[in-house]
Amino acid sequence: MESGSTAKTGDFFYGWDLLYKTVKADVSKKSDLLIALVHFLLTKHYNFRCVGVGDDKTLPEEEGSELLPDSWNDDDTKYSLRYVHDKMLYLLLGHITEGSLLINLLDINTKKVSNICVEPETLVPEVKGGITTIMPSASEIVERYRRELLDPVFTGNSREVTTQTTNSPRPIGSDPDPLRIGEPRRGGSFIPSAFEPRPFGFPDVGRGDLDPLGRGGHGNLFSFPSRPNMGPGPVPRFDPFNPLNPNRPGQGGINPDHMRPPDWNPDYYM
């Protein structure tokens, strides 16, 4: 839908004269022209197509027409027109009561409905002539139709822009891999998903033992302070890499007891 300033230009009403010529012989009351103006707005600027009269809520198979159907204004007090847009059905209903015309637009799918009340006697001084003669304030009427009747139910332009944005091509390789679990880890320690990283602030001692691929360090295989040089590389703490040296403290050999065993007094006890 064009903006309000565009609606006031002659280009906006281009095509109205053709529509008016097809219905002017049938126009019998001023409210007919107000309904015809809604029809023009729907078909010319919102790409609706009329599929007949009535209030049947069944979506028809035909594509519809830009022209008003036969018998569209046969009833003296009401109007019922059916439209389709993008395979969705809409009903345009009008009721004449106490000199006013109440118009409703109903979206059959979403059940959204809008309404507007206009005064035919005030807005339509003549039923014959050009658009500026029969409806001098046609631009203002169109703006009211758009704001009060169409926008609450149908936002065609906004919907099209959203669809184009959603369907815009994505760069190659941007599609997610359904078999991929999380991002790959680049170096550092391996922490299974069920473990909290460093829960008590301790270093990552033993974390490497949890990694079946051997990433993230040596795990529990490290040198003790009491055995600083146990051989090349990390060694198991429970199985020293080299033979025991009895002359080095802390690596086996005879170590006298500090307390005398009962009833035992060997010569070497000190």
From Swiss-Prot:
Residues 177-186 have a biased composition (Basic and acidic residues). It comes from the Eukaryota. GO terms for biological process: male gonad development; male meiotic nuclear division; positive regulation of proteasomal ubiquitin-dependent protein catabolic process; proteasome-mediated ubiquitin-dependent protein catabolic process; regulation of proteasome assembly; ubiquitin-dependent protein catabolic process. Signal peptide: none annotated. Disruption phenotype: Larval lethal. Mutant larvae develop melanotic tumors. ADP-ribosylation by Tnks increases its affinity for assembly chaperones PSMD9 and PMSD5, sequestering them away from the proteasome Rpt base subunits and promoting in this way 26S proteasome assembly. Also interferes with its inhibitory effect on 20S proteasome. InterPro entries: PI31-like (IPR045128), PI31_Prot_N (IPR021625). Residues 158-169 have a biased composition (Polar residues). A motif (HbYX motif) lies at residues 268-270. Changing R49A: Abolishes interaction with Tnks but does not affect interaction with PSMD5 and PSMD9. Changing I96E: Fails to rescue null mutant phenotype. GO terms for cellular component: cytoplasm; proteasome complex; sperm individualization complex. It holds the Pfam family PI31_Prot_N. Residues 158-270 are annotated as: Disordered. Changing G54A: Abolishes interaction with Tnks but does not affect interaction with PSMD5 and PSMD9. Transmembrane segments: none annotated. Belongs to the proteasome inhibitor PI31 family. Interacts with ntc. Interacts with Tnks (via ANK repeats). Interacts with 20S proteasome subunits Prosalpha1, Prosalpha3, Prosalpha4 and Prosalpha6, but not with Prosalpha2 and Prosalpha5. The interaction with Prosalpha4 is reduced by PI31 ADP-ribosylation. Interacts with the 19S assembly chaperones PSMD5 and PSMD9; these interactions are increased by PI31 ADP-ribosylation. This is Proteasome inhibitor PI31 subunit. The lineage of its organism: Eukaryota, Metazoa, Ecdysozoa, Arthropoda, Hexapoda.
